[in-house]
């Protein structure tokens, strides 16, 4: 029992800074929306449209680079720290190549925006302008993620938290300068949010690099002198590990986007209630997601040390802590769901629907926690391909079709509206949790030699 308590303390020490970093990142998006809304409703809508395209694109690159964390954790645990610098340098090369692709996609996203039905031309122009300003921050964001993954792979999660809050503090005044045109800068409105956010990502990257160069704990990890050339073998391995994670993230983000589109014809009350419940459940999701990042680090580190039993302990502890957290957040959600909904909107119909949907959200919080921590465990074992297959099957084969049938058709029951989609979420997330656990048990029952061989690839 003592080993589980000790492991839980280590996991929470790693996870809490990740939680705070995620809060800072979420707050940046909130600040952009509020400050753009203060300028005009059109500018706020433009930022919202631009963000809906930016997020799937940049999260694809983010997911690809998440492969670095278990790789570095495993090298650190096995005492092969001299190989870490080369992996990081190749991560920077990969981030550079991916950022070019993302920038090309975002530059041409205007065709998608302008093809939207009944969109106001002025709104479309502002959304395109916002994206074309923001895309210059894509390399800065991805380079920052490489540096952050280096730190987190070495079990240093506090730097990412500090840089997140630095970014938030810089974002507010820079937003103000470019939105309203102060200190000789042009008045750009919502487009100024894109300029500010792009600049902030570069500031965060440079601040993180400055920390890494000065950190005593990383003195033995230095990038090669001069410019290291791309190493196709290392980059191929990072892509093999990272691409399934990237695709899983992409399909998860697009699932919620598709559901939002399917809900939109149902009316303002249904859309508002759905959005409130989704926004709140997304805030609660930060807790298990951050714990999953910590579990990846611990499992990778223990496998690097050659201890499959300690890796199992880290995995089980992460799941137990995650279930306890999810139980508490579910009780909190059920108890205060109406009061929470009132913070967003005071329309009685909207509040009633949002409170009902939050009840369904409370039901799936334990499943959601298990599936996301299970994903973190599998990343630690470098078993990322199964994450993609499980996520795709659970969300797009089981969750979305069942939600569609319940919400919009009378094949099973009378059309349930948004609640049908939320029952679909429960089906999808519970299926994902079950499949993640089955895969984890399958891996852990392999002979230790095979597990360690797979982890050292």
From Swiss-Prot:
The keyword Transport applies. Residues 1-10, 74-92, 148-159, 210-242, 297-313, 371-386, 439-457 are cytoplasmic. Signal peptide: none annotated. GO terms for biological process: sodium ion transport; xenobiotic transmembrane transport. The keyword RNA-binding does not apply. Belongs to the multi antimicrobial extrusion (MATE) (TC 2.A.66.1) family. MdtK subfamily. GO terms for molecular function: antiporter activity; xenobiotic transmembrane transporter activity. It comes from Shigella sonnei (strain Ss046). PANTHER family: FMN_FAD EXPORTER YEEO-RELATED, MULTIDRUG RESISTANCE PROTEIN NORM-RELATED. GO terms for cellular component: plasma membrane. NCBIfam families: matE. It comes from the Bacteria. This is Multidrug resistance protein MdtK. Residues 32-52, 114-126, 181-188, 264-275, 335-349, 408-417 are periplasmic. Keywords: Antiport, Cell inner membrane, Cell membrane, Ion transport, Membrane, Sodium, Sodium transport, Transmembrane, Transmembrane helix, Transport. Multidrug efflux pump that functions probably as a Na(+)/drug antiporter. It is a multi-pass membrane protein. Coiled coil: none annotated. Its main location: membrane. HAMAP family: MdtK. It is found in: Cell inner membrane.
């Amino acid at each position: 029992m003592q080993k589980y308590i000790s492991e839980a303390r280590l996991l929470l020490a790693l996870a809490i800074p990740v939680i705070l970093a995620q809060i800072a990142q979420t707050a940046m998006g909130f600040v952009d929306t509020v400050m753009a809304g203060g300028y005009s409703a059109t500018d706020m809508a433009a930022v919202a449209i631009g963000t809906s395209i930016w997020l799937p694109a940049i999260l694809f690159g983010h997911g690809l680079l998440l492969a670095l964390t278990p790789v570095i954790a495993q090298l650190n645990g096995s005492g092969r720290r001299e190989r870490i610098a080369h992996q990081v340098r190749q991560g920077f090369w990969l981030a550079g190549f991916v950022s070019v692709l993302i920038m090309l996609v975002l530059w041409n996203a205007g065709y998608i925006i302008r093809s939207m039905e009944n969109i106001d031309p002025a709104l479309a122009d502002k959304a395109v302008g916002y994206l074309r300003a923001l895309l210059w921050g894509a390399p800065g964001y991805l380079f920052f993620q490489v540096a952050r993954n280096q730190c987190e792979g070495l079990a240093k999660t506090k730097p990412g938290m500090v840089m997140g809050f630095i970014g938030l503090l810089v974002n507010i005044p820079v937003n103000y300068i470019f939105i309203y045109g102060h200190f000789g800068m042009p008045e750009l409105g919502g487009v100024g949010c894109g300029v500010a956010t792009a600049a902030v990502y570069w500031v965060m990257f440079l601040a993180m690099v400055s920390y890494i160069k000065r950190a005593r704990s990383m003195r033995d990890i230095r990038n090669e002198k001069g410019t290291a050339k791309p190493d196709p073998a290392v980059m191929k391995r990072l892509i093999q590990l990272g691409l399934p994670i990237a695709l899983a993230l992409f399909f998860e983000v697009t699932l919620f986007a598709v559901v939002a589109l399917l809900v939109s014809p149902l009316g303002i009350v249904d859309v508002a209630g759905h959005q409130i419940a989704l926004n709140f459940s997304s805030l609660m999701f930060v807790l298990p997601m951050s714990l999953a990042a910590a579990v990846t680090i611990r499992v990778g580190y223990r496998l690097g040390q050659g201890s499959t039993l300690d890796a199992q302990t880290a995995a089980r502890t992460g799941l137990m802590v995650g279930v306890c957290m999810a139980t508490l957040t579910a009780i909190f959600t059920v108890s205060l769901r109406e009061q929470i909904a009132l913070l967003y909107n005071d329309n009685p119909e909207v509040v009633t629907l949002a409170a009902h949907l939050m009840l369904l959200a409370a039901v799936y919080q334990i499943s959601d926690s298990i599936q996301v921590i299970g994903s973190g465990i599998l990343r630690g074992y470098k078993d990322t391909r199964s994450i993609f297959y499980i996520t795709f099957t659970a969300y797009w084969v089981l969750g979305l079709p069942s939600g569609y049938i319940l919400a919009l058709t009378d094949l099973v029951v009378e059309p349930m509206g948004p609640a049908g989609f939320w029952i679909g979420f429960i089906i999808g997330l519970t299926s994902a949790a079950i499949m993640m656990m089955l895969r984890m048990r399958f891996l852990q029952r392999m002979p230790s030699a095979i597990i360690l061989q797979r982890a050292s690839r």
